[in-house]
């Protein structure tokens, strides 16, 4: 995620800046491609010579987002296609079909006509589970800017993932009734219930997802809305921790998304 926010996206914004010489921009494009793409490509291809099913969503998604962002910056259709194909059909937890480990009715009845989607890392800890919200948000938004609506993919499954995650993390209390499908991880064994480790983790990303689904698509997203409002104004994450890797500032960027 940092590669997109710290290198690819700023470079994309500055590509027409008259103070950045064309030859220097071309050097930068070659540098970001040569430096970061091979690592991400190798990881998604063979997961550093380990089993794809022993990985995590939060490992695959940053590599996918990096490749997609480099593809956009360099007008490289092959890389864009590679990242999107992994989202659709990849062999790893970044594949949307692999990311979802259970579909559940909302015990509280607030999510109507839809399901809560249990993500792969909900049984691991909430630091990583909430990290995936932002990763999905930025990946989908990058594709959306190119006219590819991943937010809507598979009947808006990304929203269902976010609603499950938001519902559990709205408070630090542990008395939240959460349906859970047991999930077996080849290295760590069975996950029998939602992990309370890091519960209530406040990472950026909620403003983008909530405002897109609620304002652009006109959909009901009660738990994502509550989480976005709880954290508003969305800043730059918790400085000094891993959250500082998120771009953040979602309230500033996306609160008026309906007008964009």
Each language-model region and where it sits:
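Aromatic-lined, polymer-binding surfaces characteristic
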Residues: 4-146
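CBM-like carbohydrate-recognition segments
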Residues: 150-257
């Amino acid at each position: 995620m940092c590669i997109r926010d710290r290198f690819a996206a700023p470079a994309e914004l500055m590509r027409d800046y008259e103070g950045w010489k064309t030859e220097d921009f071309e050097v930068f494009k070659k540098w970001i491609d040569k430096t970061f793409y091979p690592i991400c490509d190798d990881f998604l291809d063979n997961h550093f010579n380990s089993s794809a099913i022993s990985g995590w969503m939060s490992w695959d998604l940053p590599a996918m987002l990096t490749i997609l962002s480099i593809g956009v910056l360099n007008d490289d259709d092959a890389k864009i296609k590679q990242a999107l194909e992994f989202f659709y059909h990849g062999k790893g937890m970044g594949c949307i079909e692999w990311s979802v480990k259970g579909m559940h009715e909302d015990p509280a009845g607030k999510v109507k006509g839809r399901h809560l989607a249990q993500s792969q890392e909900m049984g691991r800890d909430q630091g990583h589970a909430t990290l995936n919200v932002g990763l999905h948000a930025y990946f989908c938004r990058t594709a959306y800017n190119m006219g590819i609506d991943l937010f809507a993919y598979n009947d808006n499954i990304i929203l269902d993932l976010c609603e499950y995650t938001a519902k559990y993390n709205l408070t630090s209390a542990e008395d939240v009734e959460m349906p859970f499908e047991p999930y077996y991880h080849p290295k760590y064994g069975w996950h029998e219930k939602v992990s309370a480790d890091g519960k209530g983790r406040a990472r950026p990303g909620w403003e983008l997802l909530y405002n897109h689904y609620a304002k652009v698509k006109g959909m009901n997203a009660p738990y994502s809305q509550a989480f976005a409002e709880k954290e508003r104004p969305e800043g730059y994450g918790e400085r000094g921790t891993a959250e500082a890797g998120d771009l953040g500032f979602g309230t500033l960027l996306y609160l008026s998304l309906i007008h964009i």
